[in-house]
């Protein structure tokens, strides 16, 4: 919800689509009521696998048409795990990977996730998808590993921080982006490396969040961080 609200507020010209697969009805209702400016497409857990797949296909094709028309589109998918489970339930190739995953069941979810791109003559499509981990299901672990290497950014949540009511509950050391040197200035990249090294040894997550909350931009954080770190 926070991501969708931030996108609609910070990038009012973008098209934000929230796709909820195999979700609880009360969660769907909550998101529809609290997120304005975004389209919510859903297939709740009381619907069958074919309905889950149909909803995902409709969203992807609609997003592609918007991109062709020059729009910048963001799909927030919750979750790629449940979508792959749906395909796994209706696929029977006769082969099986660890955890009971049919390798053919990965084809369409990969196409969905791989549709994200920045086009030269049109708009762009960004896909931010959640993946379930630590569920006790070997199938979920295999799905996560299959998609882990496909993304350009990975944000890992921390159960420990959530239990301590420290939000956002992000495992910073395990999170990161590919090609971050293209996203950050040399000074920002250097500070990022320093903070990762200090985190957990000489600096707590609370201290880091306090530093971030006291600044409005990355550039300001870079300027003031040296002073704070030397205290």
Segments from the language model and where they lie:
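P-loop NTPase catalytic core
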Residues: 1-231
């Amino acid at each position: 919800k926070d991501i969708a609200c931030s996108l609609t507020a910070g990038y009012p010209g973008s098209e934000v689509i929230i796709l909820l697969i195999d979700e609880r009805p009360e969660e769907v209702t909550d998101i529809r009521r609290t997120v304005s400016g975004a389209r919510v497409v859903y297939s709740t857990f009381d619907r069958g696998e074919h309905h889950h797949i149909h909803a995902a296909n409709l969203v992807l094709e609609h997003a592609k048409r918007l991109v062709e028309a020059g729009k910048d589109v963001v799909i927030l998918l919750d979750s790629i795990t449940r979508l792959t489970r749906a395909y796994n339930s209706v696929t029977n190739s006769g082969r099986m990977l660890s955890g009971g995953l049919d390798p053919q069941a990965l084809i369409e979810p990969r196409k969905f996730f791989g549709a994200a791109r920045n086009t030269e003559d049109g708009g762009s499509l960004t896909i931010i998808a959640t993946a379930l981990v630590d569920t006790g299901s070997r199938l979920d672990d295999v799905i996560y590993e299959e998609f882990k290497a496909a993304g350009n950014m990975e944000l890992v949540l921390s159960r420990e921080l959530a239990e301590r009511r420290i939000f956002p509950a992000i495992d910073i050391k395990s999170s990161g982006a590919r090609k971050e040197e293209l996203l950050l200035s040399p000074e920002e990249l250097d500070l990022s490396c320093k903070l990762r090294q200090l985190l957990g040894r000489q600096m707590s997550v609370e201290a880091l969040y306090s530093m971030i909350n006291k600044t409005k931009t990355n550039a300001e954080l870079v300027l003031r961080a040296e002073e704070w770190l030397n205290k």
